[in-house]
Amino acid sequence: MTPTPTLVVIGAGAKAVAVAAKAAVLREMGIAAPHVVAVERTAVAANWQADGGWTDGQHRLGTSPEKDVGFPYRSSLVPRRNAELDERMTRYSWQSYLIGTGQFAEWVDRGRPAPTHKKWSQYLRWVADNIDMNVIFGEVQQISVGSGADGQRWAVHTPEQTVHGDGLMITGPGQPERSVLPGNPRVLSIAEFWHRAAQYELIAAERVAVVGGGETAASMLNELFRHRVSTITVISPQVTLFTRGEGFFENTLFSDPTGWTGLTLDERRDALTRTDRGVFSARVQEALLSDDRIRHLRGRVAHAVARDGRIRLTLSTNQGAECLETVHGFDLVIDGSGADAAWFIPLLGQDALDLLELGLGGPLSCDTLQEAIGHDLAVANVTPKLFLPGLSGLTQGPGFPNLSCLGLLSDRILGADIGAGTEADAAAPAEARR
């Protein structure tokens, strides 16, 4: 009998829950699916709560909650049974969660509002509980590749144990603790900022800078409106603060990537720039419009130094062939420069680096990884499979790195040929879930 393969997922967020839910449903239908084991540092859906460092939990979800773990309910995994698969997945939908917890009527009567991040995390935990998701708690310290009788397998090392898998999916935005000047009380990381917000600490400063032009920085600005600050300067490389397109045609790009691969790389990058990367939602832009404290500075932070009770930022700006540098002083700097989709690279052991560089045919970088992501959201020409949905936007469509098509994401990954090691090597049982 062929052993069941194991898919290890680093991070127990929305993507991990979506893949685990569909795998569980496939097994219920009598269809082979891999064991899904998530390795998580703190808790399921932690990044949607204050403890995760990316939010205070009270801000609203930027996408419709109906884009849940099964959306868009258009599976193509099981010929002649895809409709049944979609119907079974609706048991784990956002509406099913609300019905199951007695909140559906109130949600409808309130106009179907976007939930808070905390409420969204509760939904994801509800799904994880209902599918009995296998979660091992521990911080990943290294990712390596081991050889066995059945070929190579991934090994994910935590302080307590090593989890082996025939495939590996890496999720999550990285660590929110980084900042341009670590340790300085006048420079806040993403985590430090949201910790203050969660504790209801008011920020009082004359000149505040927010570094970053993406949705992470936008949510910080949305929070800063209620604090006692005189001016807020947004620093981003773009010529202005662009608004994310949120009409039907833009949304379709996220939920239906058909035709995406027919675009040139330049066309895809242009679409991502207009709809996903470095853009603010229309809701945040409307708030910015009514607040005259907001300013914008174009540039990238090249250097930061504390001097005379202020933080001096050196901004680098390209103007034609010339690179200009200007210095600006602030009383407080909040580094919201955003997630690093390649945060995991420093965790790769030498054997894993060699494997990836061999498959890529050259040095490993964020750019080379992005351009090598195949239809199954894995790095092409690399075995065992390494799934990187966070880097798949350029080649496969803008919905895969975020929450916009979790049902399609799980289809792509569970439809891949993961292979299998031996049953004895399967991932260890999960600790009791919190």
What positions do the PLM features span?
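A conserved beta-strand/loop capping segment in the N-terminal third of enzymes
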Residues: Y73-W107
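Flavin (primarily FAD) cofactor-binding/catalytic cores of flavoenzymes
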Residues: M1-A43, W48, F104-H227, T231-R434
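Short linear sequence motifs
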Residues: S64-E66, L85-T90, P113-K119, T273
